[in-house]
Amino acid sequence: EELVELVEAYTKAVGLFRTPEAEEKVQYSEYLELDLSTVEPSLAGPKRPQDRVPLKEVKKSFLAHLTKPVKERGFGLSEDQLQRKVLVKRRDEEFELTHGSVVIAAITSCTNTSNPSVMLGAGLLAKKAVEAGLDRKPWVKTSLAPGSKVVTDYLEMSGLMPFLEALGFHLVGYGCTTCIGNSGPLPEPVHDAITAGKLVA
């Protein structure tokens, strides 16, 4: 109760306290309207986080960047280099890596891990995948690093954590990891194949 009173006093002091009556008196300097039907999923990259690519155009954009000059944020590959494939042997398995092979999948401590509906959605998706007999590819390094212990608490209480773990999304810690380059090393055979084959992966 003391904390509630403190929060109320603070929000009133800084002008953030809202009641239905007060809301009627609020005047905004600007109104923004957004047609939600125009919002579409997107990815960042392939080189800079500020380069937004609509999800439906990712394949086309990635292929175009492979041959673009490096000074134009491309990878400068020749047409011959585009077909490059590398055979990898890891633990009793053999597989091929090519340009664009996804080798890291991480659920990390960005804004999304503070959103229970998104995280529970990830857990439900993992549950469906496991129940359907699906698994990650053997060359993909996976990890789970939410920004708060609350996330693992509700994933465990909901019974969804075992399904994420079954797909390799084990808890590696709380806080920034893969997104800032703290993914740790790739499995040696995968790293060596990408390096030797000069793959964009």
Question: What is the predicted role of each segment?
Answer:
Residues 1-201:
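Fe-S-dependent hydro-lyases/dehydratases of central metabolism
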